[in-house]
């Protein structure tokens, strides 16, 4: 047994421990980067104060993004297994015209155009319309999912860009800050936003847990689900509705451009660690929550960095580590397993060749 084989066998017995050690290593690395960027004693004190949630503003933003990460990772697993990773991108872009239309309607009615509940309602409506159109194109034409989602993505984002241009040119309208929904403005989250994210997290996680058996069947074998009488189309729409809810509440935190990364990266990273669905769900939620917590903490320390982008970069770092060291599909463990298999096959071929030679040249000895 080589030392590499021994390391892999040891790691397989301690999967959760190694995964937690990787998260701890990332936390230590980010803390070191933050301390290097803030060399003063006051800056170093801020590192611990922000990471441990002692500051009210940082606590609000960190908890909100962590909850959003947990929910995004959870529903992202079903998107990934359903082979609809592009759906999150299509949905996020489908919400863009709804924000502009809601602003125009509220302004024309004499209200405050930037009233957040109204903007999110408009985003939800157009997001649902986008989901329905994707499903309609898929079931009424010969186009596949990727083509349908690509059409909806381009059309709705183009419409949103045109409407936002009208909003910016509207006389007397205060449209400042509307571009924050594109890239996210997590620093502007208030307590009401935290309550909304908490409520959506509880609802989405509860629905996903209650329907996990049905979602699993639809994700892995839709044809079998239909043959058994399961309402596959209805379950599909419920799943997309949960994704829409997560996308809408995540607009202000990470923006419609980066929300797709928040949905897919944690699920993709978790896929490298396990073949079991319930473990994958737990890992994806943990990776999403850790990415939101670490990313928002680091963004609070380095004020020139946007929160949404930092969160996605942290998630990408965890993804790269998972791609290298993940026990189920990681590059290094898979290379070790392939090397062991080749050696085993080579030994078997060698022994068989020796036996055939002995049997041919010395049949009595071979017997």
What are these regions (language model features)?
Residues 78-92, 99-171, 270-284, 298-307:
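Short loop segments and helix-boundary regions at transmembrane helix junctions
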Residues 153-207:
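Transmembrane helix-bundle core of multi-pass membrane transporters
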Residues 333-367:
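Non-transmembrane accessory domains of multi-pass membrane transporters/channels
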Residues 190-261:
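Helix-loop-helix "hairpin" substructures at the membrane interface of multi-pass membrane proteins
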Residues 8-71:
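Membrane-interfacial amphipathic/re-entrant helices at transmembrane-helix boundaries
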Residues 57-70, 116-127, 198, 248-261, ...:
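Structural signature of hydrophobic alpha-helical transmembrane segments
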Residues 62-67, 120-125, 150-151, 194-199, ...:
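Hydrophobic alpha-helical transmembrane segments
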Residues 307-338:
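Long, low-complexity, charged/polar intrinsically disordered regions in eukaryotic proteins
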């Amino acid at each position: 047994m080589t030392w590499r084989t021994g390391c892999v066998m040891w790691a397989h017995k301690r999967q959760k421990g190694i995964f937690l050690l990787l998260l701890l290593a990332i936390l230590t690395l980010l803390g070191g980067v933050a301390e290097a960027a803030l060399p003063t004693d006051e800056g170093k004190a801020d590192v611990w104060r922000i990471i441990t949630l002692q500051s009210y503003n940082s606590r609000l933003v960190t908890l909100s993004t962590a909850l959003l990460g947990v929910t995004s990772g959870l529903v992202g697993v079903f998107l990934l297994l359903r082979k609809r990773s592009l759906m999150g991108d299509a949905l996020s872009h489908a919400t863009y015209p709804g924000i502009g239309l809601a602003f125009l309607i509220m302004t024309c009615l004499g209200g405050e155009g930037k009233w957040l509940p109204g903007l999110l309602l408009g985003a939800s409506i157009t997001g649902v319309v986008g989901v329905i159109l994707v499903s309609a194109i898929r079931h009424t034409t010969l186009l596949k999912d990727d083509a349908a989602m690509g059409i909806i993505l381009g059309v709705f984002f183009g419409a949103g860009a045109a409407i936002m241009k009208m909003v910016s040119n509207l006389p007397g309208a205060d449209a400042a800050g509307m571009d924050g929904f594109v890239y996210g403005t997590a620093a502007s989250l208030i307590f009401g936003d935290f309550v909304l994210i908490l409520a959506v997290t509880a609802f989405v996680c509860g629905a996903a847990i209650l329907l996990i058996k049905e979602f699993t069947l639809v994700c892995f074998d839709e044809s079998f689900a239909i043959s058994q009488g399961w309402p596959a189309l209805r379950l599909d729409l419920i799943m997309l509705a949960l994704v829409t809810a997560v996308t809408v509440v995540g607009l202000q935190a990470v923006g419609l451009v980066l929300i797709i990364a928040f949905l897919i990266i944690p699920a993709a990273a978790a896929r490298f660690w396990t073949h079991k669905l319930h473990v994958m769900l737990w890992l994806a939620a943990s990776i999403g929550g850790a990415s939101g917590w670490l990313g928002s903490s680091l963004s609070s320390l380095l004020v020139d960095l946007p929160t949404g982008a930092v969160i996605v970069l942290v998630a990408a770092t965890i993804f790269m580590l998972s791609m290298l060291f993940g026990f189920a599909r990681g590059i290094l463990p898979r290379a070790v397993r392939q090397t062991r298999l080749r050696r085993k096959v080579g030994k078997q071929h060698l022994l068989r060749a020796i036996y055939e030679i002995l049997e041919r040249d010395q049949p009595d000895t071979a017997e």
